[in-house]
């Protein structure tokens, strides 16, 4: 790598898809997200209307995929799943890279 100019690959486009929103013991699901919602991540900021606590837990995984990495537990390249930190109703997010048309 050339430290003066950098020879980094262009970051990949990443989107976040809400896969599961389980209900807690009181029968309430996540108040921020619904199954099927899709958010585009642009590295600059948390997507609008996205739960800040969930985003904080997704951030490291977003960066791994954006920079072309892969976790040892991922079965598919460019895709990982992460749960929000709410222990009562952990929303599951699929993070995936994509090509822009």
Predicted features along the sequence, with ranges:
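A short beta-strand micro-motif
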Residues: 13-20
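Short, charged beta-turn/beta-strand-edge "cap" motif at the junction between a beta-strand
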Residues: 21-23, 44-49
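Short, compositionally biased
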Residues: 51-69
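Short, compact, well-ordered microdomains
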Residues: 67-101
């Amino acid at each position: 790598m050339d430290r003066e100019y950098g020879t980094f690959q262009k970051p990949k486009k990443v989107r976040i898809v809400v896969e599961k929103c389980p209900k807690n013991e009181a029968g309430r699901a996540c108040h921020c997200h619904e199954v099927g919602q899709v958010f585009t991540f642009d590295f600059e900021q948390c997507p609008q209307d996205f739960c800040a606590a969930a985003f904080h837990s997704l951030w490291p995984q977003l960066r791994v995929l954006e920079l072309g990495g892969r976790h040892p537990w991922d079965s598919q390249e460019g895709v990982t799943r992460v749960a929000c930190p709410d222990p009562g109703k952990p929303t599951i997010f699929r993070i995936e890279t994509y090509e822009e048309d």
